[in-house]
Amino acid sequence: MSLDLNEIYVDNAATTPVTEEVLNEMLPYFTKSYGNPSGLYMLSQESKAAIEFARDKVAKVINSQSSEIIFTSGGTESNNLALKGFCKSDIIDDQDEIIISSIEHHAIIHPAEQLTSIGYKIRYCNVDENGLIKVNEFEKLINER
């Protein structure tokens, strides 16, 4: 599908086009240097080196350690990693509560629902007519859990 110049795409929460700069940077990895970065062969090592270079670049931009940068395949994987990873860490207790919006994407709702099987409770915060969190309601949902 391609957009007519007179059309406006409004589902940018689902997918967005990449900028030409990003496309040009990624094109070699779609066409020539596409080796599995976990492999031991030369093409794999080239891919692994490119990923490590990108990881270092991102880390510098956000003033982080490269070991803290994790690349995922997309939004759903990122959401799962963030939510489940945080909940399964030692930072919080498995009896704690998770607050999500009432219009949350399934990529958050489904993993949150899975976490209820190990003791987490989901609390939903409603949104206003513009899809924005109702701050007063959100503040009431916050507690020691």
Feature map (PLM): residue ranges:
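Pyridoxal 5′-phosphate
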Residues: M1-R145
